[in-house]
């Protein structure tokens, strides 16, 4: 079934068309740019995961148009990046957040950020939106292959990582003995390791406390956390979303 999402709000000018199953392709952003969204909904919760993994297909002209649509503070941040890849990640991660807020919560105002005790960004709006918005959470992660954004009414963390060459010394540093054995025995240790890495990084971003000294035992320490891991092997990346159970 095809469905169109549209808005006349000039602050969020993107049109989404079409929607097919769980995959949503944004056919036009400022007339030309393209995105792919894969939403998920947690049981009984307002939550969505959005993925943009066609960064290589975005042209310089599309990037220029995207940057021009940003609020001034975000535009200035994007333009501080020397290379185009950094500008893409900065611009489109913000636009992906705008799209997520619009689709999940019907919020069309472009947000700004405030920062919590440990430096984790929080949403901030200029207008007097409903009290619900004070309890909205988001997290963004990006690598060369993809940008992932998750929005929720509960604390949440996300990490997306490129599947790179397996580094045994790094694996010994971040995995406990049991995890290291599983990775070493895997037919594709680089994939197995990247899964563990995204899970641990997503927990770190969920808690907002930064990486602690007990990284090898992080999954055991936070056994009250639910993890949703997706392998996108054809695109060369893996992502994990973390939130608290209950």
Where are these regions (language model features)?
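Extracytoplasmic copper-binding redox domains, predominantly the cupredoxin/blue-copper superfamily
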Residues: 6
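Core catalytic alpha/beta fold that binds nucleotide/phospho-ligands
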Residues: 2, 16-40, 48-246
